[in-house]
């Protein structure tokens, strides 16, 4: 039987990216409740130096313009081993950013899977953060001696109230730096949270839970959280908010493109707004100067080479779909897919250097193709493009950006993706039976650059 493959236009319908700015009021009320304190939350910064100074300025402006207690909460993945300047400078910009935060507001970090990218031993990372006056949380244990790298919970003064904070990470060991994996003992986050959180949060006044486990790890624990909790999620580079009774579960974006400003209200509820961090927005002068100096010192001529020009700026999701379409065209496929965290940030307009492009497409690799019955294409695209508005029940955490090319009728279709997604097809496509074969020729980055940029 001949089945028409979904057209690119049909596949893209409903895939409009979530706006990076928009108030989400958890509860409407005839009389507004007073704000008793605010949390400025962010995750997955990944040494995104193009916006680090703007983010720092935005956080300072938030605190100055709202005369209530504040907490800055970073939910993991501050550093990025794929950023050559970060590696060569030993994270000088990242550490300067962190050093500036406690002077703005009390700061807490929950460790993610990239926070030892530059310094493999997490004990050293935690000690340095504490030396800056930052509170560090984690449920990761040193497998060499059984010592926790940091406590899993703490309680801080929050104006006239007390804020209990718990933090935990992902147990996806293959996402941590290879040199450190034998030193890490990480429990299943859902099991750990369901056992430990009731005790850790018992008797708390106000509660904040920071998870770097991702949506898949978080889903099974949400119903066990206390009412009025603020839970910050990370790891998946997502931006959305989901109400939890009077509380809120929020993913805050990535790559310093956005942060979430959450208010604890006097009626026991939480509300939040997502804020964009504009590339051309106000920047902290000292950090901006350090960024310029550090880039000038550490970038090579090869990394400054202009690979091409982008005629327009693209959101992260639109960048992903454009790369997926480029894969499909190159491989003669009807559909292309790329894993969401293979990408870092959206493509900027204008000339794009090799260094800047490496922040767009983080990882190289092989292209892999498979032939599938046309009837299965809809099944495989179900989990794609989760940057769109969609029911929380359908969110999976890991996902692909996808594009379908052409609408001709055919019995089988050819799909193409990266070797990472092919290897981990259950996480990205929800199946395990796809038989992928390598696509000869250039790899992921070369094909993506050719598809995104003009000479």
Regions found by a protein language model. Name each.
Residues 1-2, 183, 367:
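Short, flexible active-site loop motifs that bind/organize anionic cofactors or intermediates
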Residues 17, 68, 227-228, 332-333, ...:
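Short, well-ordered coil loops that connect the C-terminus of an alpha-helix to the N-terminus
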Residues 22, 59, 92, 388-389:
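A short hydrophobic/aromatic micro-motif that marks alpha-helical segments and, especially, helix-coil
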Residues 29-282, 318-326:
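Acidic, metal/ion-coordinating pockets
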């Amino acid at each position: 039987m001949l089945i028409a493959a979904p057209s690119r236009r049909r596949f893209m319908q409903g895939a409009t990216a979530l706006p990076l700015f928009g108030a989400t009021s958890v509860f409407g009320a005839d009389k507004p409740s007073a704000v008793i304190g605010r949390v400025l939350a962010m995750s997955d910064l990944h040494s995104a130096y193009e916006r680090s100074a703007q983010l720092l300025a935005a956080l300072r402006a938030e605190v100055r313009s709202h005369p209530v207690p504040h907490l800055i909460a970073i939910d993991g993945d501050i550093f990025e081993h794929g950023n050559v300047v970060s590696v060569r400078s030993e994270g000088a910009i990242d550490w300067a950013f962190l050093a500036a935060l406690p002077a703005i507001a009390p700061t807490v970090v929950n460790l993610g899977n990239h926070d030892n990218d530059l310094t493999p031993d997490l004990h050293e990372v935690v000690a340095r953060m504490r030396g800056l006056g930052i509170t560090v949380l984690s449920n990761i244990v040193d497998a060499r001696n059984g010592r926790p790298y940091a406590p899993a919970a703490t309680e801080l003064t929050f104006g006239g109230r007390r804020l209990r904070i718990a933090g935990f990470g992902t147990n996806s060991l293959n996402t941590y730096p290879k040199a450190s994996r034998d030193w890490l003992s990480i429990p299943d986050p859902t099991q750990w949270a369901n056992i430990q959180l009731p005790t850790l949060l018992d008797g708390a006044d106000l509660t904040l839970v920071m998870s770097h486990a991702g949506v898949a790890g978080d889903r099974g624990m949400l119903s066990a959280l206390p009412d009025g909790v603020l839970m910050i999620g990370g790891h998946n580079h997502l931006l959305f908010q989901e109400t939890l009774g009077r509380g809120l579960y929020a993913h805050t974006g990535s790559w310093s493109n956005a942060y979430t400003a959450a208010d604890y209200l006097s009626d026991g509820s939480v509300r939040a707004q997502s804020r964009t961090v504009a590339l051309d927005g106000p920047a902290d002068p000292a950090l901006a100067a350090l960024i310029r100096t550090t880039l000038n010192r550490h970038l090579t001529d090869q990394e400054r080479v202009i690979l091409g020009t982008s005629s327009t700026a693209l959101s992260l999701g639109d960048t992903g779909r454009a790369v997926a379409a480029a894969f499909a065209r190159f491989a003669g496929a009807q559909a292309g897919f790329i894993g969401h965290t293979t990408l870092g940030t959206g493509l900027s307009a204008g000339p794009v250097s090799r260094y800047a492009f490496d922040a767009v497409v983080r990882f190289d690799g092989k292209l892999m193709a498979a032939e599938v019955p046309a009837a299965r294409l809809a099944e495989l695209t179900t989990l794609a493009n989760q940057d769109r508005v969609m029911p929380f029940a359908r969110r999976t955490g890991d996902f692909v950006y996808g594009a379908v090319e052409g609408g001709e009728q055919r019995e089988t279709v050819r799909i193409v993706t990266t070797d990472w997604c092919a290897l981990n097809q259950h996480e990205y496509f929800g199946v395990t039976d796809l038989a992928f074969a390598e696509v000869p020729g250039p790899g992921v980055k070369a094909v993506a650059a050719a598809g995104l940029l003009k000479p």
